[in-house]
């Protein structure tokens, strides 16, 4: 046991050999397929909206998934401790696969959006649960060596999504963008069922029933307030979001099991991580949603080429992330995340100019590479920085909370930019301005020196 009362010895599920390797493969597959679904739809959406109609609801296919994933992340972490990893994993996988199958059978864009909510809830439950299972499978010393596998799996799922989505649209049907998840997910679930043994359940874990409900409802009202339509209804939704948000703050101060402990809310690193998570998600998912549409509508590109357009950003993310930790150690979040978001803002600004003046595909690819080079260190150290400051027994909840802010930032920004649909230069400029504001804020408020592992 460490000083926080958390065991750092291997639990019964962390046995070496074939079973552990099989369980590792299962959670890696689950992580890939849930990350894959976040970007695979990007190259398929122009085709989907042409076939099903409802182009004015284009952004909701993304926002519904990301918002539901946020809710899934918020409720799954403690449930995995209370009920066991397997029940939460299988429930999440079940929702994800049922949602995927129904999305593949959808006959209207409204049905597709509803089924994307199911998908998102499942994906949101899967991603933190897979990371929790990986902590069960490996001792503390071993985890450092295998962490790259899980980071790489998430990155690979996001990177290949647009390419595979474009290929499926051109050579099969857009419906296979969703249906392809079913056999892969079933195989991952079978592998985990056969190879993984749950550690003892923790009956001492307290659940916050009202926190996720208030947070989810408030965010949903804010999302609805961004939908074009009746001004009175939008203002009513915005008012509801503010009231429910205030209720959430009051409830969390009184809760015995808050979503994020109050002592962490006051930590500058955590607050900086929240800002970085929201901005990182906003940039990543708004580009994933709107760049392929721009490429198909104004660039005349095929779905495969439109999907490939995102590859420089994702590769830039991977390259930039390798420098992020070095910057974090040298100058803290103020340097790593602040400089990262400044570079990302530059890339988004160049992309806006490319869209405005028609500089061509190569200029767009270069702009997205610059954006990714900045976004990689900014987003990764916005998570690693707060993790390094948090006590060991709070790191799980810090990780899931910051991951939820990334999804929430993505869902709200994709929906907000839909108000400027068709004005791609303006959309990219707004995203760049957001990154620039966050860069300035982090340069002033973020911790200015490296933190040591707790």
Q: Could you say what each language-model-derived stretch is?
A:
Residues 1-19, 201, 444-454:
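Intrinsic disorder in cytosolic terminal tails and internal cytosolic loops
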Residues 20-43, 56-64, 74, 94, ...:
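12-transmembrane solute porter fold
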Residues 31-34, 62-65, 69, 96, ...:
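Structural signature of transmembrane alpha-helices in multi-pass secondary transporters
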Residues 48-49, 79-80, 164-172, 226, ...:
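Interfacial helix-cap and linker-helix signal at transmembrane-aqueous boundaries
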Residues 73-210, 392:
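Helix-loop-helix hairpins in multi-pass membrane proteins, especially solute transporters
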Residues 95-102, 184-191, 218, 243-247, ...:
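Transmembrane-helix signature of multi-pass solute transporters
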Residues 170-276, 283, 431-432, 448:
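Hydrophobic transmembrane-helix bundles of small-molecule transporters
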């Amino acid at each position: 046991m460490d000083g926080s009362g958390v065991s750092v010895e291997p639990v019964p599920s962390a046995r070496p050999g074939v079973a552990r390797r099989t369980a590792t493969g299962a959670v890696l597959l689950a992580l890939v397929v849930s990350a894959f679904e976040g970007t695979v739809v990007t190259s398929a959406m122009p085709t989907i909206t042409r076939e099903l109609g409802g182009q004015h609801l284009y952004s909701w296919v993304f926002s519904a998934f990301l918002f539901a994933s946020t809710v899934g992340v918020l409720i799954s972490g403690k449930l995995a401790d209370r009920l066991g990893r397997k029940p939460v994993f299988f429930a999440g996988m079940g929702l994800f696969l049922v949602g995927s199958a129904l999305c593949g059978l959808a006959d209207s864009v409204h049905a597709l959006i509803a089924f994307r909510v199911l998908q998102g809830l499942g994906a949101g439950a899967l991603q933190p649960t897979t990371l929790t299972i990986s902590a069960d499978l490996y001792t503390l010393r071993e985890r450092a060596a295998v962490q790259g596998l899980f980071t790489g799996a998430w990155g690979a799922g996001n990177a290949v999504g647009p390419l595979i989505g474009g290929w499926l649209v051109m050579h099969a049907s857009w419906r296979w963008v969703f249906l392809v998840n079913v056999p892969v997910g079933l195989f991952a679930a079978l592998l985990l069922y056969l190879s993984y043994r749950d550690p003892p359940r923790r009956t001492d874990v307290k659940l916050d029933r009202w926190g996720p409900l208030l947070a989810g409802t408030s965010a949903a009202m804010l999302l609805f307030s961004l939908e074009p339509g009746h001004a009175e209804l939008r203002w009513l939704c915005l008012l509801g979001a503010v009231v429910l948000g205030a209720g959430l703050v009051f409830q969390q101060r009184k809760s015995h099991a808050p979503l994020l402990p109050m002592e962490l809310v006051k930590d500058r690193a955590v607050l900086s991580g929240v800002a970085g998570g929201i901005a990182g998600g906003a940039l990543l998912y708004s580009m994933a949603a709107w760049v392929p549409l721009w490429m198909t509508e104004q660039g005349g590109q095929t779905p495969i080429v439109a999907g490939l357009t995102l590859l420089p950003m994702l590769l830039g993310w991977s390259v930039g992330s390798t420098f992020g930790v070095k910057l974090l150690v040298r100058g803290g979040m103020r340097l790593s995340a602040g400089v990262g978001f400044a570079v990302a803002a530059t890339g988004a600004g160049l992309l806006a100019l490319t869209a405005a003046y028609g500089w061509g595909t190569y200029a767009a690819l270069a702009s997205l590479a610059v954006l990714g080079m900045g976004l990689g260190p900014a987003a990764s150290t916005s998570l690693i920085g707060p993790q390094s400051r948090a006590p060991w027994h709070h790191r799980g909840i810090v990780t899931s909370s910051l991951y939820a802010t990334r999804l929430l930032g993505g869902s709200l920004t994709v929906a907000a930019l839909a108000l400027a649909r068709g004005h791609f230069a303006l959309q990219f400029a707004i995203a760049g301005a957001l990154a620039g504001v966050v860069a300035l804020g982090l340069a002033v408020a973020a911790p200015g020196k490296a933190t040591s592992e707790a």
